[in-house]
Each structure stands twice: as structure tokens, then as C-alpha cells.
Swiss-Prot record:
PANTHER family: MYELIN PROTEOLIPID (PTHR11683), MYELIN PROTEOLIPID PROTEIN (PTHR11683:SF11). One of its GO terms (biological process) is axon development. Pfam families: Myelin_PLP. Coiled coil: none annotated. Disulfide bonds join 185-229, 202-221. It comes from Xenopus laevis (African clawed frog). Signal peptide: none annotated. Keywords: Cell membrane, Disulfide bond, Lipoprotein, Membrane, Palmitate, Transmembrane, Transmembrane helix. The gene is plp1-a. The chain crosses the membrane at residues 11-36, 60-88, 153-179, 240-269. This is Myelin proteolipid protein A. One of its GO terms (molecular function) is structural constituent of myelin sheath. Residues 37-59, 180-239 are extracellular.
């Protein structure tokens, strides 16, 4: 019975929304970074194979793609650390709220984590004649002093969410370009659905700013474009960009969940016990 009660008490302090958001964030970032990296490499191969024969015409594009790939590496590392930090903050604030409401009082961390939020010294302890501090409790006290500012985490998460919305919007651009190309290929494959001559249906990389206007040929038309759309390189790159877009959307949902949960916990900590809903 004691083991069962201990498990129940531990489960009470688990921030389920933060755990779900962390898993969603890691999955979304992994999908965005992995698929986005490979999709950029595929785009580079398609450009240099079909749209331009002069290296100087797409040299700048290669530098931009390489820069984006390095940015992707940084995004992956940052969100790995930031996700762990926000998950720790979720555990911290949930434990503090449960302690304030009298629902969950873990003996190992009540002296370190809780006093940081409540601003006072834990009950049963005085500044004089302190007892020897165990290693776990000392670690928790240090962690509590570091994580004891949920308002700052709300602000940081809000800023990161705004920045990620911009990244999410940018990830839709290549999906739009490839989708337009795919629609053009469908019109070429089924000429009865359009009154335009097949030879005039083209995909122009210069129109999207991918290549300079003096690039040659810069565009592919008619059956040549249809042949490109049927290649595994084009289809794989198109689907990778879609997967990266979905990963960016999942990461955005995770950040919004983080922000809502952190704001809720901070509000509850401010009013100290006026609400008993703290599963974030």
C-alpha cells in the first residue's frame, strides 16, 4: 500500500501538458530539421541539374542553402536544451503549486524548490542550527533558485514562439513553389484539362528569386518539366518539404502549449492557492 501511495503522490506532481509538449516539440523539431536539411540538398541538385548549367549563376544559392543548413543544426541543439529546461520548469512550478495547495509535498525538494517561489523559509527550519543538507536536497535548492522565476520563462517562451511563427511561415514557401510546379506538371500530363498549349506550361525558378534573371535556361517547359516531376529526386524533395512544414507546425503547437501552461502556473503561483488545477 505504501508503494502504491508513493506512486500516486509522484504522479500528482507530473506536469502532463509539459511532458506532452516536450515530446511534441522534440518530434516536430526533429522532423523539421532532418527533412528540411535533406530537402534543401535535393533542391540544390535539381537546380544544378535541370535549371542552370553555369555554376556562377547558382553559386549564391548554394551559399544560402549551406547557411540555412547550419542554422538548422543550431535550431536542433537549441530546442533540445530549451525543451529540457521548460520541462524542468513545468515540474518545478507544478511541485510548488501542489505544495502551496497542500496536495503534494515531496520531502527531498520541499526545502529548495518551494521556498524560492513562495519567498519564505520552509516550515520546520530556522536560520540557526541548520541540519546537514543531503546532496539531493542541495541540488534541488540550487535548481530551485535557478528555476524560481516562471515569469521570465513565460516571456522567453513568448518571444521564441513569435520567432518560430516566422520560421513556420517561411517553411510554407518551398511547399508553395513545389506545389505550383506539381500542378503545372498535372496540367501537362492531362492536356485536356487546360486550353493552354503544353509547350507554354513552364516552371521558372527565376520567378521565385531562386536564380538570377540572367540564368540560362532558368526555366523548364512542356514534356521536359513533366519528366522532372516524375523523377524520384523531385518527388522526394517535395514530400520532404511537406514533412518539414508539418514538423514546424507541431513545434508551434508545442510552444503554444508551453506558453499556456507556464502562464497558467505563474498565475496560480501569484494568487497562491486560489485554483487547484495545476496539471501543467
Amino acid at each position: 500500500m505504501g508503494w502504491h501511495d508513493g506512486c500516486i503522490r509522484c504522479m500528482v506532481g507530473v506536469p502532463f501538458a509539459s511532458v506532452i509538449a516536450t515530446v511534441l516539440c522534440f518530434a516536430g523539431v526533429a522532423l523539421f530539421c532532418g527533412c528540411g536539411h535533406e530537402a534543401l540538398s535535393g533542391t540544390e541538385k535539381l537546380i544544378e541539374t535541370y535549371f542552370s548549367k553555369n555554376y556562377q549563376e547558382y553559386e549564391y544559392l548554394i551559399h544560402v542553402i549551406n547557411a540555412f543548413q547550419y542554422v538548422i543544426y543550431g535550431i536542433a541543439i537549441f530546442f533540445f536544451l530549451f525543451g529540457i529546461l521548460l520541462l524542468a520548469e513545468g515540474f518545478y512550478t507544478t511541485t510548488a503549486i501542489k505544495h502551496i495547495l497542500g496536495e503534494f509535498k515531496p520531502p527531498a525538494i520541499k526545502g529548495g524548490l518551494i521556498s524560492t517561489v513562495t519567498g519564505g523559509t520552509p516550515k520546520g527550519r530556522s536560520t540557526r542550527g541548520r541540519q546537514p543538507v543531503h546532496t539531493i536536497e542541495l541540488i534541488c535548492r540550487c535548481l530551485g533558485k535557478w528555476l524560481g522565476h516562471p515569469d521570465k520563462f513565460v516571456g522567453v517562451t513568448y518571444i521564441i514562439t513569435i520567432l518560430w511563427i516566422l520560421i513556420f511561415a517561411c517553411s510554407a514557401v518551398p511547399v508553395y513553389i513545389y506545389f505550383n510546379t506539381w500542378v503545372t506538371c498535372q496540367s501537362i500530363a492531362f492536356p485536356g484539362k487546360t486550353t493552354t498549349s503544353v509547350s507554354t506550361l513552364c516552371s521558372d525558378a527565376r520567378m521565385y528569386g531562386v536564380l538570377p534573371w540572367n540564368a540560362f535556361p532558368g526555366k523548364v517547359c512542356g514534356t521536359s518539366l513533366l519528366a522532372i516531376c516524375k523523377t524520384s529526386e523531385f518527388q522526394m524533395t517535395f514530400h520532404l518539404f511537406i514533412a518539414a512544414f508539418v514538423g514546424a507546425a507541431a513545434t508551434l503547437v508545442a510552444l503554444l502549449t508551453y506558453m499556456v501552461g507556464a502562464s497558467f502556473n505563474y498565475a496560480v503561483l501569484r494568487v497562491t492557492g486560489r485554483s487547484d488545477r495545476s496539471k501543467f
